């Protein structure tokens, strides 16, 4: 692998990695979080032993980075209940279903919920308009020939974009 490729975060040194691994291995046996982290680390090492193609490794790496980012975004809202709403990105604002989605989202916000949609237009936009930007998450998947996020959620820190799903 070329080490000159641009990275979003610098790689930790071998000493830093070993230090983190030692801390993990020294965790008490009854530490559930440490046990899960050990399993994740073992799985990652098995990926190396599997001799995967470089493109497969890049997919795994990107997917893990995207998940870590999404967890950081959602973490600040752990105390809020959320409802995921699925629907067509092609539903027009004059469609009765658009209006129903808008009203439903407005009503669930009154009950203390936030909405999660794919973040595009159609039903997704109706839900985010009904809930308002402050009560909306967009979980967008980059697809060829698809539209971007709707105006309500675009450029919002609660818009999370995934390449892989």
PLM regions with names:
Residues 146-165:
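Conserved phosphate- and dinucleotide-binding cores of soluble alpha/beta proteins
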Residues 2-150:
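Glycine-rich beta-alpha loop segments
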């Amino acid at each position: 692998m070329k080490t000159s490729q641009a990275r979003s975060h610098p790689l930790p040194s071998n000493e830093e990695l070993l230090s983190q691994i030692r801390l993990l291995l020294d965790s008490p046996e009854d530490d559930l979080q440490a046990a899960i982290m050990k399993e994740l680390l073992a799985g990652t090492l098995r990926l190396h032993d599997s001799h995967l193609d470089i493109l497969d490794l890049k997919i795994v790496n990107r997917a893990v980075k995207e998940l870590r980012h999404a967890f950081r975004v959602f973490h600040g809202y752990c105390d809020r209940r959320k409802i995921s709403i699925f629907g067509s990105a092609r539903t027009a604002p004059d469609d009765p279903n658009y209006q129903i989605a808008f009203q439903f989202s407005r009503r669930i916000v009154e009950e203390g919920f936030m909405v999660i949609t794919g973040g595009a237009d159609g039903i997704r936009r109706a839900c985010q308009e009904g809930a308002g930007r402050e009560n909306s998450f967009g979980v967008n998947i980059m697809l060829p020939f698809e539209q971007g996020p709707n105006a309500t959620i675009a450029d919002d820190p609660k818009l999370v974009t995934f390449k892989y799903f």
